[in-house]
Amino acid sequence: YDKVEFHITGXTKDTYSAFIQSLRTHLS
C-alpha cells in the first residue's frame, strides 16, 4: 500500500483510505 499512498497525497488520500481498507479485507 506504500505505492498507493505515495500516489495519493492530498485530500483524496482520506477517501482512498476507505478503498484501501476494502482491499485489505479481500487480501486478508
UniProtKB/Swiss-Prot annotation:
InterPro entries: Ribosome-inact_prot_sf (IPR036041). The lineage of its organism: Eukaryota, Viridiplantae, Streptophyta, Embryophyta, Tracheophyta. It comes from Iris hollandica (Dutch iris). It comes from the Eukaryota. It is an enzyme of class 3 (hydrolase). GO terms for biological process: negative regulation of translation. Keywords: Disulfide bond, Hydrolase, Lectin, Protein synthesis inhibitor, Toxin. Disulfide-linked heterodimer of A and B chains. Belongs to the ribosome-inactivating protein family. It catalyses: Endohydrolysis of the N-glycosidic bond at one specific adenosine on the 28S rRNA. GO terms for molecular function: carbohydrate binding; rRNA N-glycosylase activity; toxin activity. Gal / GalNAc-specific lectin. Agglutinates both native and trypsin-treated rabbit erythrocytes but not human erythrocytes irrespective of blood group type. This is N-acetyl-D-galactosamine-binding lectin subunit A. Its EC number is 3.2.2.22.
